């Protein structure tokens, strides 16, 4: 009887491994502060067609999608929690949440990207192909990550030494790469260019997996052929 139980147990493990091999995990991390309003309206129209295109190109994929909508530390202090949805196949649920977003808040120019990245590490990642997709027009906190005028700290970066209550963003990004999660970034504004250059440096320092698994695009269009091609190619390579 024990032998039969072990056979069933091993069979279940094999089935889960096979399922994970065909699974594709995509987590979208979106800045939902006031400055993102025009992009978010476009994003609402593009989100579902983007998923449909990925599913068309990878019909065998078990596509799981998660979502984090983040703002800034002062918004959290005011009780305005971030939107935080785990990886799921309930695309209608994600789509409804996205369509109900009303951008506001933000305070100073940088936003709490480090906090959003920390939340991303708690998602139920299981696929061989794991992608975190950051979309923002503002840099993270910290003087290393932007060239904003520091003579007006209250307006530019209230947390110039990063979040006093959380991890340094370098450590969080290293943790992301340590879980073999690919980082895709949509660069919407020149203010984020220095930050993305620093992310690339951190990525190269870790040397955890090939640099082709990190992807930056300067574009204001989420529903972009280049993005879809990159996701599909990565999935087919890692399946």
Residue ranges and their predicted role:
Residues 1-239:
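Divalent cation-coordinating acidic motifs and surrounding scaffolds
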């Amino acid at each position: 009887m024990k032998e039969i139980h072990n056979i069933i147990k091993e069979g279940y493990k094999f089935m889960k491994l096979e399922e994970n091999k065909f699974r594709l995990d995509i987590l979208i991390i979106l800045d939902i502060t006031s400055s993102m309003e025009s992009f978010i309206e476009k994003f609402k129209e593009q989100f579902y067609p983007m998923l449909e295109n990925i599913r068309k190109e990878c019909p065998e994929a078990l596509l799981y999608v998660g979502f984090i909508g983040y703002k800034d530390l002062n918004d959290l202090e005011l009780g305005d929690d971030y939107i935080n949805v785990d990886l799921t196949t309930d695309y209608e649920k994600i789509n409804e949440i996205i369509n109900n977003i009303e951008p506001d808040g933000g305070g100073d120019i940088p936003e709490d990207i480090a906090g959003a990245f920390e939340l991303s590490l708690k998602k139920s990642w299981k696929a061989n192909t794991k992608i975190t997709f950051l979309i923002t027009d503002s840099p993270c906190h910290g003087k290393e990550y932007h060239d904003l005028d520091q003579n007006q700290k209250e307006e530019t970066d209230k947390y110039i030494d990063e979040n006093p209550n959380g991890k340094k963003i370098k450590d969080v990004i290293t943790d992301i790469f340590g879980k073999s999660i690919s980082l895709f970034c949509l660069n919407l504004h020149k203010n984020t260019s220095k930050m993305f250059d620093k992310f690339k440096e951190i990525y190269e320092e870790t040397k955890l997996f090939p640099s082709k698994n990190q992807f930056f695009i300067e574009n204001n269009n989420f529903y972009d052929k280049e993005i879809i091609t990159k996701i599909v190619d990565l999935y087919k390579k890692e399946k």
